[in-house]
Curated annotation (Swiss-Prot):
InterPro entries: Cyclin (IPR039361), Cyclin-like_dom (IPR013763), Cyclin-like_sf (IPR036915), Cyclin_CLN (IPR014399), Cyclin_N (IPR006671), Cyclins_cyclin-box (IPR048258). The keyword Phosphoprotein applies. This is G1/S-specific cyclin CLN3. It comes from Candida albicans (strain SC5314 / ATCC MYA-2876). GO terms for molecular function: cyclin-dependent protein serine/threonine kinase regulator activity; protein kinase activity. One of its GO terms (cellular component) is cyclin-dependent protein kinase holoenzyme complex. Belongs to the cyclin family. Pfam families: Cyclin_N (PF00134).
């Protein structure tokens, strides 16, 4: 390596970055400096995220009209993608952005059953390019080996073009983790109530960690994910965390604080006259009360205690970074929810002691919650083939053999409609795909190669009804 070559300079930068990353004091100083600078633009950031969010929402009614893709197949794909993200050590925002790209594409194009995994990995590839470091972005060979040679390298490039064209090159979308960070910083920098700000600041790490865990869990449940926006999911996750971890903050007051942000003059100063992005509140009190009920808490216990296998690997691995803390948080949350559902009977003497403690610590009782019969279904279980698994050794192996498969018919272009407008897939024109890009994918030595684990790629992510 030449001393003045770009590679030499890159190695020096990598070495300096590793030295800085190992210096905890330097990291703390940089974080405080970053927080102080960002604090000045928090309202502008909130307005921008809410404005972009309204333009990048998927359409559930169109996704349900998919002829081959069912909502029951979705958790299998997301579980597979989360496992890939965990093994490749990608950023936290990569997963929610990948899910957003998949759902938005399914809202505009018909997706074949055998192309569902291809769509998921390509969306993950696009998200990596936007959010992760260059050296973490998987190559085409890596993608091919991750899916156990189910697709050719050229098909990922072809699918990437279709996704970008279908989404009109609008890739970035606000994710729930971005809102969680912003909500936490807004509350910590709240000058009107220093007591609450100090309480949140002391528990900010636990609040962010457990809120992100709940937000990732909600991605697997369509009736939560599609009924609420990313900003609302982030707020619901924070409220659940404050409730279950027994942080002494009133939930209604916390909800009113966030809803009041969009009514301040500082926030409204960012809204142009005549603009469509007028926001009255983030999550209404009625929506909050209708969601936080006994039925929801019962299912929330099941969701928290029984996460998908990929989230178990990410948060509860034996040598994981947050495994001990997450186990403590999950145990505390489950016990709190069980106490809410079945409160422990107490004696009159114990009640008088509790009242004395509440008066001494200025405890504010939580408001009563309405009860209805809405329920959250458990994660669907597949009786058929699950997504092809892989290991890190497979990704970087030198074997370049690829089994021959048929690409099939590509998803057609949809007619242009306004966002949220219901339409039928019967009015979609078929997209003609040139045979030059597909005919060249045949293998010369097809007879000498063996197929990988799955003998029929058409059954990937298929749930028997």
């Amino acid at each position: 390596m030449f001393p003045n070559s770009p590679d030499a300079f890159h190695q020096v930068r990598m070495m300096q970055s590793s030295i800085k990353a190992s210096n905890f004091k330097l990291q703390s100083m940089e974080f405080r400096c970053h927080s102080n600078n960002v604090c000045e633009y928090q309202m502008e950031m909130l307005h921008h995220l809410l404005s972009v969010e309204a333009k990048t929402l998927p359409n559930l009614s169109l996704i349900e009209q998919q002829p081959e893709i069912k909502l029951g197949m979705r958790p299998l794909l997301l579980d597979f993608l989360m496992e890939v993200i965990t093994i490749l050590s990608l950023s936290r925002s990569t997963f929610p952005l990948t899910v957003n790209l998949i759902d938005r594409y399914c809202s505009t194009r018909i997706v074949k059953k055998q192309h569902y995994q291809l769509l998921g990995l390509t969306s993950l590839w696009i998200s990596c390019k936007n959010l992760d470091s260059k050296f973490k972005v998987p190559t085409l060979n890596d993608l091919r080996k991750i899916c156990v040679d189910s697709y050719y390298k050229e098909l990922f490039v072809e699918m990437e073009k279709h996704i970008l064209k279908s989404l009109e090159w609008v890739v970035n979308a606000p994710t729930f983790d971005a809102f969680i960070d912003l909500y936490s910083n807004l509350l910590i920098s709240n000058s009107s109530n220093f007591e609450v700000a100090n309480i949140i600041k002391k528990s900010s790490h636990k609040i962010k960690l457990f809120s992100n865990y709940i937000g990732e869990l909600f991605q697997f449940y369509p009736n939560i994910y599609y009924d609420y926006t990313s900003s609302q999911i982030a707020l619901i996750a924070i409220l659940i965390t404050v409730l279950t971890l027994k942080i002494p903050v009133d939930l209604i007051s916390l909800l009113n604080f966030y809803n009041g942000l969009v009514k301040t003059e500082m926030f409204k100063s960012n809204v142009e006259q005549g603009a469509e992005d007028q926001f009255e509140e983030i999550l209404s009190v009625d929506s909050f009360k209708s969601l936080f009920n006994k039925s929801f808490f019962k299912n929330l216990i099941k969701i928290i205690d029984n996460p998908p296998s990929s989230l178990k690997i990410k948060y509860f691995a034996e040598n994981g970074k947050y495994s001990v803390l997450m186990k403590q948080l999950v145990t505390t949350a489950s016990n709190t929810l069980k106490c809410i559902l079945d409160p422990v009977p107490t004696t009159p003497k114990a009640n008088s002691f509790v009242k004395h403690q509440q008066q001494q610590h200025h405890y504010h009782p939580r408001p009563p919650m309405s009860i209805n019969t809405s329920m959250i279904p458990l994660t669907p279980v597949s009786n058929s083939t699950s997504p092809n698994r892989f290991s890190p050794d497979q990704i970087f192996s030198e074997n370049e053999s690829t089994p021959g498969i048929a690409f099939g018919t590509m998803t057609p272009d949809s007619q242009s409609t306004s966002p949220g407008e219901k339409r039928s897939y019967e009015c979609i024109d078929e997209l003609e795909i040139g045979t030059s890009t597909i005919a060249g994918y045949t293998l010369k030595n097809h007879d000498t190669l063996k197929r990988s684990k799955s003998a029929n790629y058409g059954t990937l992510f298929y749930l028997q009804q």
